[in-house]
Amino acid sequence: MRVHFGGHLVYYQAERQPWAEIHIPGPLLLDQVIDQLRIPRGEIAISAVNGEAVDARTYLVTDSDEVQFFPPTNGG
């Protein structure tokens, strides 16, 4: 699975890169992947799989998916 960490979310992975390859044994809820990556839920505003926004609590991902996480935006 290819995972994109948007914005400051790169700091939640050791390599501090915007993209990472991870492998999962079979279909998992996206929430379980977030747990494995140790990203606090409040830090993710949007989760997308293969370019479509999804509900991480109910969406099953596979090893062939491309996942993107985006933090909340700031500004005015």
Regions picked out by a protein language model, each given a short descriptive name:
Residues M1-G75:
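Ubiquitin-like/PB1-type beta-grasp interaction modules and other compact soluble beta-rich domains
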